[in-house]
């Protein structure tokens, strides 16, 4: 039962992470604000389009972190407590986004509308790149070590220690972390462009968005394929199920796909959906539903990658400083009682998702138009 609960909560956390990557279309759209929005009217439509969804992304980010903390507290204390500069910059950029939406159109703001929109662009770049880089460490490893004997130390009962003074920023010195960060960034821009096509009724702007889809897709595929191929052919961090010893296994993540055919099927279906949504949007000028195909494909693809990082006797948060300090589902999770209690609460998740879909549908009943922006009402 305990093993089932560990795997169940890794599935929940992975699903939240996958949904978060999809919702980064808000950041991707904002990063294009000055690239696509050459007029004030276009920029206002873009800001109001993403402005109606930014709370979904922010809430999912917080929920993802909360679920990770509750189910795998040792990861939370190790990563959030050790790599705190990386996570603080990510969180600060999202707070900057929230402030920008709320204050850019308020009368008498001292910084001016353009400054707040620049903050949105900063979040649109920093958020996806650093989140992608943080997730990449699940496959490349981090610089930390753990000494559980310190739990008995009444003066310094700290069991997780970061191995350098960069506290997370050192992740950006690994080229493969940067590559996945860039892949997530360009994917977010693709998703943002597809979202604008679906959400804004302005031919000139949506034509620019289709060109942005094409250009950013090329860059996304280059970085994404490079990271995936490298990950599948490299050694992975395996766990001996009997002794819990962690060791390097050739082709570990490829082996995980082969030994978990359902996860492999999810990955392949996800990739096909991503490409279908992009391809049909580019080939058929009247097609505006690409965000849904590519969005669902993104969730399935990211979910499958996170599952191979933690399932099948794999260390999901490896340490290259001390291999035996690497975190696994078994050595970093909460107690069985805690996981079981939270599992009962998680039954409510489908109802929350249903409410989100209902709210989304209500907000997007009509596409955003220039006329709507000119008429006033609530706008950013």
Tell me what each language-model feature is:
Residues 29-43, 71-76, 98-119, 196-209, ...:
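Membrane-interfacial helix termini and the short, flexible loops that connect transmembrane helices
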Residues 246-251, 318-338:
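Short, membrane-exposed interhelical loops at transmembrane-helix boundaries
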Residues 332, 337-380:
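C-terminal functional modules
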Residues 23-31, 59-107, 123-151, 183-188, ...:
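Transmembrane-helix bundle segments that line or gate the permeation/cavity pathway
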Residues 42-62, 87, 113-127, 206-220, ...:
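Juxtamembrane helix-loop boundaries in multi-pass membrane proteins
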Residues 1-58, 62-65:
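N-terminal signal-anchor module of multipass membrane proteins
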Residues 107-287, 304:
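Long, contiguous internal "core" modules enriched in hydrophobic/ aromatic residues
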